[in-house]
C-alpha cells in the first residue's frame, strides 16, 4: 500500500527540506511552541511563531507553509486565524490544521469549521480529535486527513498511506503530536502531494522516536533524544528501519 | 507527625492517580506550561491548558481538578479565572492556587483574594508568597496551606504534615514549584483529604528530586532526570527513601 | 582590541552577578521564556516574566534590568512596553532590546523605533535584524549595538569588543539568542559599562556553548549541556578557553 513511500522517496523529501530550509509559520499552543521550534530546526526547517493579528500575515507572507494548532487558542490567536487563511488562499500556500482537544470545546469546533473550508487543507489529529471532526471532514472534498496513533493513517487525494513507526513513549511527552504536525507542514512546503509529504514527515518522526526510545531512560529524556535522532537521520537509517 | 503518611499511603495515592488518570486543567504561566504538562504525564495524569475565557469552562468541565497559577497572568487569563471558580464551586471540584510572585503585584493580590473565597481551596507557595498571603489566609477557614522549601509544611484541616525531601537544585530550575502544584492537584482529584493528597504529591516530587540530583550534572539536566524518576517511582523506592 | 576584557574581568563581572543575584524582568516571547529563565538561573540571576499591562511595572520595579524581546509580541505585550520604558527612564534602569525578526514585521519596526528612543539602550540581534535596524540605530547616539554571529561584535560608547566564542549548534536550538540577550541584561544590572557587560555575558555564553558542543549528541541535548556548563563556569575555565 505504501509502495510509493519507500526509503528513497522519504529521503528525497527530507533532503528537499534540508536544502530549501522552508520557513513554517506556526500559530500554535504555548505548551508546544518550544519543542515544535526545536523539532523544525532539527529537521532543517525554520520556525516563526508570530501571533499578533496586526503582524501575523506580514510574518507568514514569505513562509513556505502554515500550521494552525488550536491548543491554548487565545482571543488574539482567534483573530489571527482569518488573516492566515486569507494569506494561504491568496498564495496557495499549504496549511496544516492540528485540532487539539477539539472534542472538548465548541469554540475550537467552530474555528475548525472555518479552517476546513480552505481548499487542499491538511488535518492531523489523534483518534478522538479526528472522530469529532468526521462530520465536517465528510463535507470537505480534497482534504488530507491524518489520524495518528500506533499506526498512522493518511487519507490523501492521491491515496492511502499507513505508517507503522513510533513508540508508546511518544504519547507521554507533551507537544510531540503538535510538533509532528509542524513537520508535516515543512514537507508540504517542498512536496506538492500532501499524502507523500505527510508520509515522509511521519516516517521520519516515527523512526526518530524508535531510536530515541532505545536511548531514553524515560519520558524526561525522550524528547532530547528524539530531536538528536531527527537531526542525524539519513537514508541508510531509513533503509534499515523501513526494512 | 506524619504517621498517617507512610510509604504505603503515598504509594496508594500515586496508584490511584495512575489508575484513574485524572485530567488536571491548568491555567498556568507560559514559562512553566511545558514542564508542568510533562510532569503530570510522568505522574500518570493528563494535562489540559485552555485559557480562552470562551472555552475554559468547557475544557475544564470534565477535569478531575483545577490549578490556577498567577505567573504571567494575562488579561484573558484574568477573565478565565471567574469561569473556573464558578465551575469548581458548582461541581465541588478541587482547586489549587499557586500565587507566583504575589508579593510583587497588587493585581495578583486582588486575584488571590477572589480565589481564596472558594471553600476547600488549596494554596501552595514559597515562603515569601505564603507570608504575603498570610492575612488573607487567616480569614479563610478550611483552606489547606502549603509552604514549600527545604522542609515543606502542609497545614490542612485534617492536620499538619511536614515533608523533608527534595534537593537545592530544585530551586535552580524554572517552573518546578509550579509543576509541584499541578501534582498536588492531580492527587486532590483522587484523594478527598487535601492534606494527604498534598503530602503524597510533595513526597513523590521530593524523592524524584533526590534521585535526579544524584544523576544530574547541573540544573540543565536536572528536570529531565526528575521527570524520568517520577515516571518510574514505585513503592519499593518510596519505602527505601522514606526510611 | 579586547585588552580590557580578559578572563579576570569577565570572571569579576560574573562573580558580581552571582553575588548580587539581580532580577531581570523579561518581556519575552513565549517560545524562549523557559530556556531564558533557566539560563538566568544558571547564571545566578533571577527571572521574572510578567506581561500584563496592569502589573508589569509593579513586578519590574525592583528588577536590576529589563529585557524586551519582540518575538511573539501580543497586543497585551505591546501595551506593556510603554510601562517598561517609563520605568526604565524614571529609574535609569538598564534595558536590552532583542528585535527578533524585526525585518519581517512593520509592527515590530514601529515598536523598535519607540524603544530605541530610550537613552543608553542596548540592542542585541543577528545580522539580518541589526541590518534592518541600522537606519534607526544611526540616529541613536549612546546606544550599544550587539550583532551576534560566528564572531559577536559589540559597538559600545566605551569602544568595540569582538567575541569569537561559541559553536554552530547554537543556531540550531530555539531561544538561545534570546537567552543570551537576557544574560547581557543580567550583566548590565551589575556593570555600568554596557560594552563590558555585554562582552562578559557573551564570552560566558560562547564558552559554555563550546563546552556543551563537546558533550552533546545533537541539538536536542545541547541546551541542557549549555545550561550545565554555564552553571559551573569558573575563572580557571575562562582562562583556559580565552587563551
Regions found by a protein language model. Name each.
Chain A
Residues 5-8, 207-243:
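Charged C-terminal helix
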Residues 28-33, 168-181:
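Glycine/serine-rich anion-binding loops at beta->alpha junctions
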Residues 174-207:
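Short, small-residue alpha-helix embedded
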